[in-house]
């Protein structure tokens, strides 16, 4: 069986790289070494390096572990919290249900 590869949009790659860079900067601002950060997050230094480069092959769970170990987990809750477009689409799709009365033969 051939190995499936996922094709990523350029925007996706750009977002992951920026996210990884933001995590790296957060670590450096706290004067935390990569070895200590990896230990706190429960991941290997190689995985942390991949995260800080924005690798799409690293699991979301590992990214979250780094966020938690940096005290930034609340930022994750902001993702898609205010889905303005989704709410507009939902509101546009809402319709008033009308009851259908059944005709009974009496």
Which ranges hold each PLM region?
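Helix-turn-helix DNA-binding elements, focusing on the entry/boundary residues of the two helices
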Residues: 23, 34, 45, 60-63
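Short alpha-helical DNA-recognition segment
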Residues: 31-49
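Short, basic-rich loop-to-helix N-cap that marks the start of a DNA-contacting helix
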Residues: 55-68
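The alpha-helix within a helix-turn-helix
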Residues: 27, 38, 67
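A short, Lys/Arg-rich alpha-helix, primarily the initiator
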Residues: 5-29, 79
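Short, charged recognition helix plus adjacent turn
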Residues: 77-106
């Amino acid at each position: 069986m051939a190995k499936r590869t996922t094709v990523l949009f350029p925007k996706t790659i750009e977002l992951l790289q920026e996210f990884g860079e933001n995590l790296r900067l957060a670590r450096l601002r706290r004067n935390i070494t990569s070895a200590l950060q990896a230990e706190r997050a429960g991941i290997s230094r190689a995985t942390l390096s991949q995260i800080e480069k924005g690798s799409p092959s690293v699991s979301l769970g590992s990214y979250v572990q780094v966020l938690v170990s940096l005290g930034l987990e609340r930022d994750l809750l902001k993702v898609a919290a205010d889905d303005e477009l989704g709410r507009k689409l939902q509101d546009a799709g809402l319709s008033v249900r009308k009851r259908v009365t059944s005709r009974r033969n009496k």
